[in-house]
């Protein structure tokens, strides 16, 4: 009865097999296969085998003998499955397609909040940790910058708010409900925990592949390996495919478990320091055994300590012994700093790692240098010789220094413990840069070069001032705006950056803000950058930090340059210089007092100072002319040969010696 | 007597006017009057040749006879009459000077411009002749026959007759008044005869002198006009320079030179309409750098020395669409373009302006997301960061739509024009005119009105409320300086002069100004050396350089 025929058209073999499969399914049912039904299947099978032309669509199938409405409906699943498999070549798609009668799986739109949440969950839970908590997930998704709309239910300060709806309870986080409904994410309560399902992880991988996002090499390699056997076996007959799919399921789990042992961010943090992945994995396992489900930052510190202990107490070759000796004094310095209660404790720990492994980090930097040199354009139009920190003869910048981004501690987002602080940390990990928070005498953001062995710090030639639109408006009104620009100009930086955050068109002072931007750029020479919100500003800081490092790293100390070029000031001398700028002399105070008089311009004030450097000297001169008011009024004009106009001369007299 | 009768008969025939008959009735010596008016019939033809305005002058000729009568009466009068006649002569002169002016103006108005000057000269001559006539009666009183001969001699030339007629007519006018007053009847024959020969001599001299005067006056006028024109020109130039220095004409003189490729895109229409609204001049043509805009200033030659930097504005704008920009970045050619621009314009600020860059990238990423292809996001963020860090004076600006692009370019043009004339930030300009008063001050408005209060706030670490306390006690700087400059008080006493002043607290509790603030104010205001830091002065650094006994 079930004799297989020769299929005339090779392309129809799949369809013929499908018909046989359907017949088998019906035969296995409790009802059994009736005579009429069996006859119908046999007729259809023969027609498919005898067809000379390929059957690609349901229309083609309906025109063949033996395929009526019922049979066409039955065969519909094959064509839907075939379309999906041809497009995506993915067995889970086939399976899902069969179950859902050919519907596509849910994939969130690019740069939507669901998209960001899904990818964030995938990245953060690949390395062993199974779930994330709500606030943690929200902050991480915000920091990734994958979503164009804010994720959190509360609008943080400094974020550009895009209104979705006037209802207060609606926010980007509402997408999580959709993800849970679609079966991509599961949730448990008290407290709320969110975890990806297997389906969710596959969808996240799909999103990453489609958008071309960078991901860790291991994860990519795993993703690449999985589809290969599936793709190869897809053209085979269906029974074979289903068998292969079943076989693969047990293999996926062990790999996921093995790979999920280490969070990706910890790997990203320690790899640049020269630690091997095996070392990091081993240390993390030991630490995670000791502690329960804690925050990655805590585990991060523990892993750091464990790695250092392993290095110190394990047997070392001679070179390592020499490194150990050299790192001794730095340890003591670090301890002193810890005693002082430095706010940059975490980041100094990072630097400790780099300090302990100078050669290793140098080699890793060398690798980066090679790759970046290959990618570089080679068309740098630098017209000025940059100021460099001190370098040994023949030493390159990257061999000696790290570039660190310093944020002012008066910035609200930079304060420790704030919610937006997490954004800063995520930027730190994403861009692989170091960020510290200190009190800056001028500006909101500077970059320093810190020596890898000596721990000395030098201020590089870049400074940024950040202002959002509302700040800008009030600053223009009460004149802080001009005062701050003047202080930035006098601070000695060569590259002045002014970042305007937010859209000035929404402000009622839009014209004055735009004019101020033009004046700042054209007249004062600032580089004015526009961003939409705090997240974009911080990402801009990240890109600038990497670019500054690129700018300096291949600088070499030549005798000619060292003689001609000036050196970067140290951080302490920079702070002192800025404090000195705020100090005034007696003549400066007198000049400012003169500037308060109507009709007195800057030239007039300077002319008065040339003749009378102090207020006392001017008052004495007026007292000598007592009882002759007209002579007193004209005194400054006469003595300056009309450089000081009559009205200004009279007004100054009124201030100093008028009744 | 017979001759007189004959002459009178002739006049009756020629002058039928009724006015003559009336006058003959008034005066009994009608025969003498008629004989004196012999030249009258000759006058009429020249009058007719001139404009009709001379017709009203006919009554003046009748007055001529009256003049002669009055002169005769003077000659025969006694000493008293001589004195009176002298006074009257003075008054006559003044009257005569007044009377011809309206006539002159009338004649000048009617007569052609070319004829005005000779008329003016004639008037001058007549006035001088009249003055000499006043002196004649005293010297020549008995030469009756010579007067008659002179009269007959003058009647022959027409021009001379005209001159004489005009002179006599004016004399008649003044004499009428005298005649009415005196009412004395005497013969007047010898008087005009004496005056005539002297008039001839003086007229010739007067003519040449007057011509010289004319030339002098004309030269003076020309010189004055020239000097006035020069002064006006100077003032105009100075005003223009001031306008330029203030930058009022900047927007009118700036010219935007736009590359044709910029206008070919979707931005062109909006940009042109915006520029025309503002009235900014545009020059469209191929620029050395593609898709660029550069600006120049059209400056008049007079004002060019004020701008040593010349008409070029060191700013260049590159305008790109999103797709073109992404292609340049992906191919690695964008930085080459920037380098080429900097080679061509070494000292210029370069700004790269893109339109719809972010929305374009998002759109392409979404398309790539749905239907995977070969497109990859170019490293835009890295390249833009590199512009900021690796290059000097290279900026970037990203607009969301064409309207924002046009608005930015027009705003940039206006700012480039106005910033050429603005002063840069300096320490003094930042704190001018009360700018140093902080916004938190409750008495901000009060302080801004008083220069003395602002001067107090300018002292470092003196808060506005401290300044108010000092101001209430010493409302002017002089009142405080007088106390500080008083030699009878000790330095220590002056330093703590202000310590007990009441300062109004925020909540309401008063506190004292304090010793430190009082000392600070004294030492800053009374410092002799302007170069010391205020922090050092507050600690008493001035005492090391000066002897304590100076104050």
From Swiss-Prot, chain A:
Ubiquitous but preferentially expressed in young flowers buds, notably in anthers. GO terms for cellular component: condensed nuclear chromosome; nucleolus. Induction: By DNA-damaging treatments such as MMS, cisplatin and gamma-radiation. Its cofactor is Mg(2+); Ca(2+). One of its GO terms (biological process) is mitotic recombination. GO terms for molecular function: crossover junction DNA endonuclease activity; DNA binding; metal ion binding. Keywords: Calcium, Cell cycle, Cell division, DNA damage, DNA recombination, DNA repair, DNA-binding, Endonuclease, Hydrolase, Magnesium, Meiosis, Metal-binding, Mitosis, Nuclease, Nucleus, Repeat. InterPro entries: EME1/EME2_C, ERCC4_domain, Mus81, Restrct_endonuc-II-like, WH-like_DNA-bd_sf, WH_MUS81, XPF_nuclease_Mus81. A motif (Helix-hairpin-helix motif 1) lies at residues 59-78. Disruption phenotype: Sensitive to the mutagens MMS and MMC. Increased sensitivity to gamma radiation. Deficiency in homologous recombination in somatic cells but only after induction by genotoxic stress. Decreased pollen viability with morphologically aberrant (small and misshaped) grain. Moderate reduction in meiotic crossovers. The double mutant mus81 send1 exhibits severe developmental defects (e.g. Two distinct classes of crossovers have been demonstrated in Arabidopsis. Class I is MSH4 dependent and exhibits crossover interference. Class II is MUS81 dependent and exhibits no interference. Interacts with EME1 to form a DNA structure-specific endonuclease with substrate preference for branched DNA structures with a 5'-end at the branch nick. Typical substrates include 3'-flap structures, D-loops, replication forks, nicked Holliday junctions and also intact Holliday junctions with a reduced efficiency. May be required in mitosis for the processing of stalled or collapsed replication fork intermediates. Plays a role in DNA repair and in genotoxic stress-induced homologous recombination (HR) in somatic cells. Belongs to the XPF family. This is Crossover junction endonuclease MUS81. The gene is MUS81.
From Swiss-Prot, chain B:
InterPro entries: EME1/EME2_C, ERCC4_domain, Mms4/EME1/EME2, XPF_nuclease_EME1_plant/arthr. This is Crossover junction endonuclease EME1B. The keyword Metal-binding applies. It is found in: Nucleus. Its EC number is 3.1.22.-. The keyword Signal does not apply. Belongs to the EME1/MMS4 family. One of its GO terms (biological process) is DNA repair. Keywords: Calcium, Cell cycle, Cell division, Coiled coil, DNA damage, DNA recombination, DNA repair, Endonuclease, Hydrolase, Magnesium, Meiosis, Metal-binding, Mitosis, Nuclease, Nucleus. SMART domains: ERCC4. GO terms for molecular function: DNA binding; endonuclease activity; metal ion binding. Its cofactor is Mg(2+); Ca(2+). It comes from Arabidopsis thaliana (Mouse-ear cress). Residues 37-51 have a biased composition (Polar residues). It comes from the Eukaryota. Pfam families: EME1-MUS81_C, ERCC4. Interacts with MUS81 to form a DNA structure-specific endonuclease with substrate preference for branched DNA structures with a 5'-end at the branch nick. Typical substrates include 3'-flap structures, D-loops, replication forks, nicked Holliday junctions and also intact Holliday junctions with a reduced efficiency. May be required in mitosis for the processing of stalled or collapsed replication fork intermediates. Plays a role in DNA repair and in genotoxic stress-induced homologous recombination (HR) in somatic cells. Forms a heterodimer with MUS81. Residues 202-239 have a biased composition (Basic and acidic residues). Residues 1-55, 187-239 are annotated as: Disordered. Residues 203-253 form a coiled coil. Residues 287-484 form the ERCC4 domain. One of its GO terms (cellular component) is Holliday junction resolvase complex.
């Amino acid at each position: 009865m079930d004799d297989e025929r020769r299929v005339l058209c090779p392309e129809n073999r799949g369809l013929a097999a499908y018909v046989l499969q359907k017949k088998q399914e019906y035969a296995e049912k409790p009802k059994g296969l009736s005579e009429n039904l069996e006859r119908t299947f046999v007729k259809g099978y023969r027609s498919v085998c005898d067809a000379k032309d390929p059957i690609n669509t349901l229309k083609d199938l309906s025109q063949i003998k033996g395929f009526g409405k019922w049979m066409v409906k039955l065969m519909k699943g094959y064509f839907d499955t075939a379309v999906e498999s041809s497009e995506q070549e993915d067995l889970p798609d086939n399976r899902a397609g069969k179950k859902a009668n050919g519907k596509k799986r849910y994939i969130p739109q690019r740069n939507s909040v669901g998209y960001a949440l899904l990818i964030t969950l995938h990245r953060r839970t690949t390395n062993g940790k199974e779930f994330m908590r709500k606030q943690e997930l929200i902050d991480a998704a915000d920091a990734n910058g994958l979503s164009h709309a804010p994720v959190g239910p509360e609008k943080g300060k400094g974020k550009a708010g895009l209104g979705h709806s006037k209802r207060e309870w609606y926010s980007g986080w509402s997408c999580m409900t959709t993800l849970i409904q679609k079966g991509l994410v599961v949730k448990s309560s008290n407290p709320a925990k969110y975890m990806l399902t297997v389906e969710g992880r596959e969808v996240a991988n799909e999103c990453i592949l489609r958008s071309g996002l960078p991901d860790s090499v291991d994860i990519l390699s795993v993703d690449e390996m999985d589809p290969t056997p599936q793709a190869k076996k897809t053209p085979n007959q269906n029974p074979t495919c289903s068998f292969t799919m079943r076989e693969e399921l047990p293999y996926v789990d062990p790999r996921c478990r093995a790979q999920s042992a280490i969070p990706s961010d910890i790997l990203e943090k320690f790899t640049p320091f020269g630690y091997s992945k095996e070392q990091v994995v081993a240390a993390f396992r030991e630490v995670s055994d000791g502690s329960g489900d804690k925050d990655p930052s805590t585990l991060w510190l523990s892993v750091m300590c464990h790695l250092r202990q392993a290095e110190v107490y394990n047997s070392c070759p001679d070179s390592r012994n020499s490194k150990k000796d050299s790192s001794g004094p730095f340890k003591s310095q670090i301890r002193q700093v810890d005693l002082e209660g430095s706010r940059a404790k975490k980041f100094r720990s990072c630097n400790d790692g780099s300090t302990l492994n100078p050669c290793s980090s140098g080699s890793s930097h060398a690798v980066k240098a090679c790759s970046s040199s290959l990618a570089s354009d080679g068309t740098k139009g630098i017209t000025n010789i940059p100021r460099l920190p001190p370098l040994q003869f023949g030493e390159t910048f990257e061999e000696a220094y790290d570039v660190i981004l310093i944020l002012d501690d008066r910035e609200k987002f930079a304060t420790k413990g704030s919610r937006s602080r997490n954004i800063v940390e995520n930027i730190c990990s994403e861009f692989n840069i170091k960020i510290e928070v200190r009190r800056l005498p001028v500006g909101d953001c500077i970059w320093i070069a810190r020596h890898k062995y000596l721990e000395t710090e030098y201020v590089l030639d870049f400074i940024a001032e950040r202002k959002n639109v509302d700040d800008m408006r009030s600053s223009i009104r009460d004149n802080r705006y001009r005062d701050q620009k003047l202080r930035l100009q006098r601070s000695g930086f060569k590259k002045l950056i002014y970042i305007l955050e937010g859209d000035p068109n929404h402000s009622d002072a839009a014209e004055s803000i735009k004019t101020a931007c033009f004046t700042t750029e054209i007249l004062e020479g600032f580089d004015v950058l526009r961003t939409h919100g705090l997240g974009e500003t911080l990402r801009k800081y990240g890109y600038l930090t990497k670019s500054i490092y690129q700018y300096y790293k291949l600088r070499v100390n030549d005798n000619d340059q060292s003689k001609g070029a000036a050196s970067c000031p140290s951080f302490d001398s920079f702070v002192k210089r800025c404090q000195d700028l705020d100090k005034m002399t007696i003549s400066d105070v007198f000049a400012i007092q003169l500037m308060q008089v109507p009709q007195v311009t800057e030239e007039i004030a300077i002319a008065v100072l040339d003749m009378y450097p102090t207020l006392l000297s001017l008052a004495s001169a007026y007292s000598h002319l007592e009882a002759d008011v007209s002579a007193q009024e004209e005194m400054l004009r006469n003595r300056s040969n009309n450089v000081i106009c009559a009205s200004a001369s009279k007004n100054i007299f009124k201030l100093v010696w008028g009744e | 007597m017979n001759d007189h009768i004959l002459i009178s008969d002739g006049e009756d025939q020629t002058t039928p006017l009724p006015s003559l008959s009336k006058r003959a009735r008034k005066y009994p010596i009608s025969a003498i009057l008629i004989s004196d008016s012999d030249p009258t019939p000759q006058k009429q033809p020249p009058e007719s040749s001139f404009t009709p305005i001379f017709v009203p002058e006919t009554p003046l000729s009748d007055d001529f006879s009256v003049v002669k009568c009055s002169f005769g009466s003077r000659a025969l009068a006694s000493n008293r009459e001589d004195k009176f006649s002298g006074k009257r002569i003075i008054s006559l002169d003044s009257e005569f000077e007044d009377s011809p002016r309206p006539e002159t103006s009338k004649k000048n108005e009617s007569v052609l411009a070319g004829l005005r000057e000779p008329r003016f000269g004639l008037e001058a001559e007549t006035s001088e002749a009249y003055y000499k006539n006043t002196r004649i009666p005293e010297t020549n009183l008995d030469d009756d026959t010579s007067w008659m001969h002179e009269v007959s001699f003058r009647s022959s030339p027409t021009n001379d007759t005209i001159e004489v007629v005009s002179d006599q007519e004016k004399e008649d006018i003044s004499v009428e008044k005298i005649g009415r007053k005196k009412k004395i009847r005497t013969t007047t024959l010898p008087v005009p005869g004496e005056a005539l020969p002297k008039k001839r001599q003086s007229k010739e001299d007067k003519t040449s002198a007057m011509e010289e005067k004319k030339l002098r006056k004309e030269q003076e006028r020309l010189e004055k006009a020239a000097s006035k024109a020069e002064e006006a020109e100077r003032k105009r130039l100075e005003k223009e320079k001031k306008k330029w220095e203030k930058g009022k004409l900047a927007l009118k003189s700036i010219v935007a030179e736009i590359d044709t490729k910029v206008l070919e895109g979707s931005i062109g229409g909006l940009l042109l309409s915006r520029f025309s609204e503002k009235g900014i001049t545009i020059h469209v043509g191929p620029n050395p750098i593609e898709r660029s805009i550069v600006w120049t200033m059209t400056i008049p030659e007079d004002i060019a020395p004020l701008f040593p930097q010349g008409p070029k504005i060191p700013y260049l704008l590159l305008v790109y669409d999103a797709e073109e920009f992404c292609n340049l970045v992906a191919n690695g050619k964008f930085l080459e373009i920037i380098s080429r621009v900097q080679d061509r314009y070494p000292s210029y600020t370069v700004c790269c302006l893109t339109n719809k860059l972010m929305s374009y990238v998002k759109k392409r990423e979404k398309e790539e997301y749905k239907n995977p292809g070969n497109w990859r996001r170019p490293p835009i963020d890295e390249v833009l960061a590199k512009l900021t860090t690796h290059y000097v004076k290279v900026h970037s600006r990203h607009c969301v739509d064409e309207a924002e692009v046009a608005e930015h370019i027009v705003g940039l043009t206006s700012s480039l024009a106005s910033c050429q004339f603005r002063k840069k930030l300096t320490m003094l300009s930042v704190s001018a005119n009360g700018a140093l008063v902080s916004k938190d001050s409750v008495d901000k408005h009060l302080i801004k009105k008083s220069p003395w209060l602002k001067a107090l706030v300018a002292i470092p670490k003196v808060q506005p409320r401290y300044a108010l306390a000092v101001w209430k006690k010493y409302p002017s700087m002089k009142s405080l300086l007088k106390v500080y400059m008083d030699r009878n008080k000790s330095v220590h006493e002056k330093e703590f002069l202000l310590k007990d002043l009441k300062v109004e607290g925020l909540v309401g509790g008063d506190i004292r100004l304090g010793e430190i603030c009082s000392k600070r104010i004294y030492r800053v205001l009374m410092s002799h050396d302007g170069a010391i830091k205020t922090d050092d002065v507050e600690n008493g650094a001035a005492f090391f350089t000066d002897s304590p006994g100076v104050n």
